[in-house]
């Protein structure tokens, strides 16, 4: 407040506006509060010498109330109301502030210079294509030509055979045979010539003369290759018991395989696991003879205008190619020649980014992509593609990708700024960046173009970065190595994201805070003239009293007083001066609980003034709210009416909320530089494929189901066949008959031998031998009997009857010998001779039947002649003797 008697100083317009707002709020506050009742709860007794104002506003002299007059019965006392306020709103401390004497003076600090608000980095939006190191090998189709040579040594026993050794080797197919036989006719020679221990050796299939054998498709084929061969079965030598025999098998194999080669492409490996120490790009065309090779010149041949033939269908290719053929000690390999550029590229495209922001951070660029959640750091100097070895594909693929993305997304809203730029980022990533400019800022195109030109390497033209250099590389080239993990770029993206957000937020807060303090300093300087005590207290941080001493403030420390030691009077009228009233309530207080009572006047914000000089003319309709303790007291017509808590008065906040943007959520997506398939396929040799092919080789080019059993007579038949084969057509015809007869004999003998080798057959043969021995014994006895007594042996029954008939005669007397009949004896002899003739005729007829028809007829004629012979000279005997009759 200004000193008394001095005119009010001129206030600036912002201060006047602020004071007007405060005054309007002060006038609105009583209206917002509850209107006092007609019969207030605590209406003080008016003094007798103070007049009560009427409705017209003219005051009537009425006596002033006493200093501590009590209220009427039935109304709450002021002390009780204050106690309720303190119990409800909490305790509040009062302060007694003595007037400052000028012993301590203070001044406000001058405005400070504020930091500049961060205006952000120089961002450039654009399209990016990120390239990585190409770890995939160069793959191409190759054809292997070789002959599997197998020499087996077998020992044959009587009942079994045993392999004593197997020699296996591979021999290359000569160039002439590949061109004139395999590719021209689909056949292969049955011989194999190869060098081992510096000596040339020749193997003949089946140990026979050289001939052409047709190639047939392999029985089992893989998804990536085909194969052809000439024979399924291994040749085994002929069986000769107790001798060692040798047999040779030559299997000509043509196999399509996959070949791989990795940087620097000095060698390649076949899917079978065989290494070829020659660059796949070696040849005699376009300067390719400078590529690496480890073989002599006569082992390599390059054929122009080569038409490859499909050995399965016999069809010839429609277009000719340049064919490379190389002979190694084990095989011959052929492949289609191709130039090194652009067949291979040391870089490959990794990601296409539709939105890539490029920000300047000191001497580096940071390329950020929200889609990839990554930030790549690169030098601000462009990277020349001519420094990368075999990178012709980068410029072509980058331009194609940029043009495709631009036409799809930015064709109607943006324009391209300059050419595609290339930057080598940390981790070995090559970024092809195409800056874009929106159509709204197209007028800045020239400025941006000039800026881009200044960033180019010294001495470079505008098309150098986008257009690959000449085919001849500079003397020193390098290969970009890309890390297998991109986590560092993702961490960089996270750090940049948080750093950008926090730095922008804190920078703007610091700038706004500084500017606010400087602006508030002006208000503080003007407000201290109105209420220096409040300004000084707010500035110092504790309750003080202050007054202006020119351009400085004199301050004094306030003494705190407990709320229980403060008593408020319920009337603010001045008894001695009619028409004059106190502008603020009167209070009595004690510094200590048992100290003397001191009179004072309630100031602002619970300040107790030791002087009661705050006066004003009494007015009609007086209503005031005064802060007392933790609440408010309401005075109406200069008398206490009732109390209010702070919550009963509508609060108008002067606090300015600090609206800070929270850090936005961001989800990381899985990101791989190289997939599992790329890592698996990055090696020069695929061991899985090698093992699969090696184990499938026997199934593809050999018959594993057919079993050849050793034949002891194979040598005999082979010799006979060779003998009759050399006699021409007649010899072959005779040979068939002889071979049939010999085969029958051998089969019979083999059948008997097989029967005897059977246990049941041996038992049967043993029984037959015993039966034969028994029959021979009985036959021998019969022959001996026949020699001793033919009649008894031949006619045992007749002899027995004759013997029984002659027995009585012999036993009847001595005259028996004399009675012997000579005629009967002669008849008996005749009968024996007749029986011998009959037996001879039967034997003759039996032999004639065996000899044939002519002999049988001769026997019949002889029989007829014998039957027509003269009648015998004897007659049959009668049953009774004539002498007896």
Curated annotation (Swiss-Prot):
GO terms for cellular component: host cell endosome membrane; host cell Golgi membrane; host cell plasma membrane; membrane; viral envelope; virion membrane. It is found in: Virion membrane; Host cell membrane; Host endosome membrane; Host Golgi apparatus membrane. Residues 704-757, 716-756 are annotated as: Hydrophobic membrane proximal region. Residues 35-759 are virion surface. Residues 781-885 are intravirion. It is a single-pass type I membrane protein. Residues 29-46 have a biased composition (Low complexity). Pfam families: Glycoprot_B_PH1, Glycoprot_B_PH2, Glycoprotein_B. It comes from the Viruses. SUPFAM superfamilies: Viral glycoprotein ectodomain-like. Envelope glycoprotein that forms spikes at the surface of virion envelope. Essential for the initial attachment to heparan sulfate moieties of the host cell surface proteoglycans. Involved in fusion of viral and cellular membranes leading to virus entry into the host cell. Following initial binding to its host receptors, membrane fusion is mediated by the fusion machinery composed at least of gB and the heterodimer gH/gL. May be involved in the fusion between the virion envelope and the outer nuclear membrane during virion egress. This is Envelope glycoprotein B. GO terms for biological process: symbiont entry into host cell; virion attachment to host cell. Its main location: virion. Belongs to the herpesviridae glycoprotein B family. The chain crosses the membrane at residues 760-780. Keywords: Disulfide bond, Glycoprotein, Host cell membrane, Host endosome, Host Golgi apparatus, Host membrane, Host-virus interaction, Membrane, Signal, Transmembrane, Transmembrane helix, Viral attachment to host cell, Viral envelope protein, Virion, Virus entry into host cell. Residues 154-160, 239-246 are annotated as: Involved in fusion and/or binding to host membrane. A motif (Internalization motif) lies at residues 874-877. Residues 1-34 form the signal peptide. A motif (Golgi targeting) lies at residues 834-837. Residues 47-58 have a biased composition (Acidic residues). Disulfide bonds join 97-558, 114-514, 188-252, 345-393, 581-618. InterPro entries: Glycoprot_B_PH1, Glycoprot_B_PH2, Glycoprot_B_PH2_sf, Glycoprotein_B_ecto_C, Herpes_Glycoprot_B.
């Amino acid at each position: 407040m200004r000193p008394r008697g001095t005119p009010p100083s001129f206030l600036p317009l912002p201060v006047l506006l602020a004071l007007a707002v405060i005054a309007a709020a002060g006038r609105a506050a009583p209206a917002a509060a509850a209107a006092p009742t007609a019969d207030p709860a605590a209406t003080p007794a008016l003094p007798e010498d103070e007049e009560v104002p009427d409705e017209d506003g003219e005051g009537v002299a009425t006596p002033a109330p006493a200093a501590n007059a009590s209220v009427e019965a039935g109304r709450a006392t002021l002390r009780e109301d204050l106690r309720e306020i303190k119990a409800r709103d909490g305790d509040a401390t009062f302060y007694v502030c003595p007037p400052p004497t000028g012993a301590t003076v203070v001044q406000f600090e001058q405005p400070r210079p504020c930091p500049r608000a961060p205006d952000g980095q120089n961002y450039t939006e654009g399209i990016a294509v990120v390239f990585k190191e190409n770890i995939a090998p160069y793959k191409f189709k190759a054809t292997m030509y070789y002959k599997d040579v197998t020499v087996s040594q077998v020992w044959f026993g009587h009942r079994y055979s045993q392999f004593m050794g197997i020699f296996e080797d591979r021999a290359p197919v000569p160039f002439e045979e590949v061109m004139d036989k395999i590719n021209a006719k689909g056949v292969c020679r049955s011989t194999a010539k190869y060098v081992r221990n510096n000596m040339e050796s020749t193997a003949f299939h089946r140990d026979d003369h050289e001939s052409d054998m047709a190639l047939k498709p392999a029985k089992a084929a893989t998804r990536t290759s085909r194969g052809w061969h000439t024979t399924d079965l291994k040749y085994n030598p002929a069986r000769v018991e107790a001798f060692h025999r040798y047999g040779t098998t030559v299997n000509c194999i043509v196999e399509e395989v996959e070949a791989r080669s990795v940087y620097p492409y000095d060698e390649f490996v076949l899917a079978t696991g065989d290494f070829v120490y020659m660059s796949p790009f070696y040849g005699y065309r376009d300067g390719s003879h400078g590529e690496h090779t480890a073989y002599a010149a006569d082992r390599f041949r390059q054929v122009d205008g080569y038409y490859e033939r499909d050995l399965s269908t016999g069809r010839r290719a429609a277009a000719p190619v340049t064919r490379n053929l190389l002979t190694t000690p084990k095989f011959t390999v052929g492949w289609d020649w191709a130039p090194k550029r652009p067949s291979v590229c040391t870089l490959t495209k990794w990601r296409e980014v539709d939105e890539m922001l490029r920000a300047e951070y000191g001497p580096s660029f940071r390329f950020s992509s929200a889609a990839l959640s990554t930030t790549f750091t690169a030098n601000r100097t462009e990277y020349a593609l001519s420094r990368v070895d075999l990178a012709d594909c980068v410029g072509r693929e980058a331009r194609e990708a940029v043009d495709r993305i631009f036409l799809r997304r930015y064709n109607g809203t943006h324009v391209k700024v300059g050419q595609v730029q290339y930057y080598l980022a940390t981790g070995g990533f090559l970024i092809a960046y195409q800056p874009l400019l929106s159509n709204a800022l197209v007028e800045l195109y020239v400025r941006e173009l000039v800026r881009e030109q200044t960033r180019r390497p010294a001495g470079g033209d505008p098309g150098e970065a986008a257009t690959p250099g000449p085919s001849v590389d500079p003397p020193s080239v390098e290969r970009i190595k890309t890390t297998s993990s991109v986590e560092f770029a993702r961490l960089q993206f996270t750090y940049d994201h948080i750093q950008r957000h926090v730095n922008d937020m804190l920078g703007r807060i610091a700038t706004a805070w500084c500017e606010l303090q400087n602006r508030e300093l002006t208000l503080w300087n003007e407000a201290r003239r109105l209420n220096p005590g409040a300004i000084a207290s707010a500035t110092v941080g504790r309750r003080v009293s202050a007054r202006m001493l020119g351009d400085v403030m004199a301050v004094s420390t306030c003494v705190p007083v407990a709320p229980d030691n403060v008593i408020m009077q319920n009337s603010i009228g001045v008894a001695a001066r009619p028409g004059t009233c106190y502008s603020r309530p009167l209070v009595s207080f004690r510094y200590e609980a048992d100290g003397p009572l001191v009179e004072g006047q309630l100031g602002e914000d619970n300040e107790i003034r030791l002087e009661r000089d705050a006066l004003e003319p009494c007015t009609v309709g007086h209503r005031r709210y005064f802060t007392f303790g933790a609440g408010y007291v309401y005075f109406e017509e200069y008398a206490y009416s009732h109390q209010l808590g702070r919550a009963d008065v509508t609060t108008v906040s002067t606090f300015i909320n600090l609206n800070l943007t929270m850090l936005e959520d961001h989800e990381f997506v899985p990101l791989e530089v190289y997939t599992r398939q790329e890592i698996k396929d990055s090696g020069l040799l695929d061991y899985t494929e090698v093992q699969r092919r090696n184990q499938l080789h026997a199934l593809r080019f050999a018959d594993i189901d057919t079993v050849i059993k050793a034949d002891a007579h194979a040598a005999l038949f082979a010799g006979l066949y060779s003998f009759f084969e050399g006699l021409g057509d007649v010899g072959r015809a005779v040979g068939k008959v002889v071979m049939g007869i010999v085969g029958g004999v051998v089969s019979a003998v083999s059948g008997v031998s097989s029967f005897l080798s059977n246990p049941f057959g041996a038992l049967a043969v043993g029984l037959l031998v015993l039966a034969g021995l028994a029959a021979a014994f009985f036959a021998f006895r019969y022959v001996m009997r026949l020699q001793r007594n033919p009649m008894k042996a031949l006619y045992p029954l007749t002899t027995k009857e004759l013997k029984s008939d002659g027995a009585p005669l012999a036993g009847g007397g001595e005259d028996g010998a004399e009675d012997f009949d000579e005629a009967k004896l002669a008849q008996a002899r005749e009968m024996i001779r007749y029986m011998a003739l009959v037996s001879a005729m039967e034997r003759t007829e039996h032999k004639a039947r065996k000899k044939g028809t002519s002999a049988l007829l001769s026997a019949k004629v002889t029989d007829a002649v014998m039957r027509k012979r003269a009648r015998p000279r004897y007659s049959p005997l009668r049953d009774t003797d004539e002498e007896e009759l």
